[in-house]
Design a protein with these regions (language model features):
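Conserved G1/Walker A P-loop phosphate-binding module
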Residues: 1-96
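C-terminal effector modules of nucleic-acid-centric enzymes and ribosome-associated factors
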Residues: 12, 19-22, 155-158, 306-311
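Residue-level signature of catalytic and energy-coupling elements of molecular machines
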Residues: 27, 33, 52, 95, ...
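Active-site glycine-centered loops adjacent to acidic/histidine catalytic or metal-binding residues
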Residues: 27, 151, 186
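Alpha-helical scaffold elements adjacent to nucleotide-binding pockets in ATP/GTP-utilizing enzyme cores
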Residues: 33-37, 58-60, 105, 112, ...
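Conserved Switch II/interswitch segment of TRAFAC-class P-loop GTPases
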Residues: 88-92, 96-102, 111-136, 140-162
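Conserved catalytic-core segments of large NTP-driven translation/proteostasis enzymes
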Residues: 170-311
Length: 311
């Protein structure tokens, strides 16, 4: 893939569309897929690590390179700047919780996605995966292109694997879903990863960017980064997390956050009060940026009170 020098300089630090959702039932291998692709465990919160499950949307940037074969730049990759010369794609992954009780958390992120990787374990029959059906239905309603990973094939014999594949094909046909490709995988052993990377580059390509449009940033998370017991004079403002959909956003820009503060007035009528704030910082993974174009998941440092940005 050939980039202009300007776009190449951008994608080295900022993911360019699309954002890819990681969907599927709980325990089927979504977070393991993210970890093996990026080198990072998306389950960063202590309660997630204790329960070994995704509770809040996990965000990780994925850098895909190509030199004789497809591979990724990870946390422990040596000579990262040298490997950057082989960069062909840079995108963000949204790891969504698969538990049935957390379906609304997944739905809050669906509009940020331009495509989805759906992970399905072959170790259990589909009738034990109601969350998978919900995720597939959401992806269909959002008209997302889908790459499907048939995972954990090392846990079943050939006969069972073929049976599970037939069940999957029948369910997809019943729902009217045609995935771009079905990739056989075993993420715990690293099988199928190179093929998956090739399919990501092929089916989720970089999109054309027009930064002259009006700014529209969609947020699905906010953060209070202050630790308990922090001195009031040392409190830092809140962080807004999400993705820029249109336009170009830079440090110093003023934005309007809607719906803002909402409640009911004396008449019992619902009201909302948008508030204005200024962008003080922009963070993409470990990179601090001065401006961003559409694509990728960002954290915006604002002047908003941290009390309004608590999870």
């Amino acid at each position: 893939m050939n980039f202009t020098n300007e776009i190449y300089d951008i994608i080295k630090k900022q993911p360019v569309n699309p954002n890819i959702g990681m969907l599927g039932s709980v325990g089927d291998g979504k977070s393991k897929c993210v970890q093996i692709l990026t080198g990072f465990n998306p389950c960063t919160h202590s309660d997630e690590q204790i329960r070994n499950m995704t509770i809040k949307p996990g965000y990780r940037n994925l850098m895909i390179c190509h030199k004789n074969k497809y591979y990724t730049i990870k946390k422990k990759t040596k000579n990262k700047e040298k490997e950057m010369e082989n960069l062909v794609h840079h995108l963000s992954i949204i790891d969504c919780p698969g538990h049935q009780e957390l379906i609304f958390i997944m739905l809050s992120s669906i509009l940020l996605m331009k495509g989805a990787i759906v992970v399905v374990s072959a170790a259990e029959p589909l009738n034990q995966k109601p969350q998978l059906i919900q995720h597939l239905a959401a992806a269909k309603l959002a008209n997302l292109p889908i790459i499907l990973c048939h995972n954990k094939l090392d846990l079943v014999d050939k006969k069972i694997a073929l049976k599970r594949k037939k069940e999957l094909d029948e369910k997809l046909e019943e729902m009217g879903i045609v995935p771009k490709v079905i990739v056989p995988t075993c993420f715990s052993r690293g099988y199928g990863v190179e093929n998956l990377l090739e399919q990501i580059v092929k089916h989720f390509p970089q999109t054309t960017v027009n930064d002259d449009d009006d700014i529209l940033f969609m947020s699905n998370r906010s953060f209070d980064i202050n630790k308990p017991g922090t001195n009031a004079l040392e409190l830092k403002p809140g962080i807004i997390g999400g993705s820029l959909l249109t336009g170009k956003l830079s440090i110093g820009d003023e934005i309007i956050v809607t719906p803002g503060i909402f409640g009911k007035n004396n008449k019992g009528e619902l009201y909302y009060d948008p508030f204005h704030t200024k962008i003080d910082s922009i963070q993409s993974d470990k990179y601090s940026l001065r401006s961003i174009i559409p694509g990728g998941l960002m954290g915006l440092g604002t002047s908003v009170s941290p009390a309004l940005c608590k999870n």
